[in-house]
């Protein structure tokens, strides 16, 4: 595998325009509680964000993509193809205590008609929640850096257009968010020691990152 020439780290601040439904699979308080970390704080996993972005780029996991791919050989004479993702996405955490709420729902049958005796409730985060996450691009020898930048720009545009949504119930308008601020920093062999602090949130705050 080619050597990494540069790491580009982006710090993105976001605001949710609609409620968010991100289930943990736990039903302690409702039939579907919000995903929380070990400190009981809500978050959205980086893998979930990455999945939404890949879907927006319309790339299958077997197609060459900024986010990696894996393709099995068609015959014994051929070799498997693949590449690890050049894009890392951190979990999305919230900057302050978001507003929780509980919504009642009813199950639908195959004809999309409500089944009144099958009601359930879900825990959600209300719109207006503020959060942030990191994106990191590893640029290697022979990579098309401009194409990578284009894909990132396309992803950001997709977020702000409401086409990349997070969580469940997206068809009901949930999970819409906008990027309010982006800051980026490049790490090369000239400043690679600084990479140790790349995910230090205080560093980005001290750099004067503010919402648009």
Per-region residue spans from a language model:
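RNA-binding basic/glycine-rich loop and surface signature characteristic of RAMP-family CRISPR effectors
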Residues: 1-212
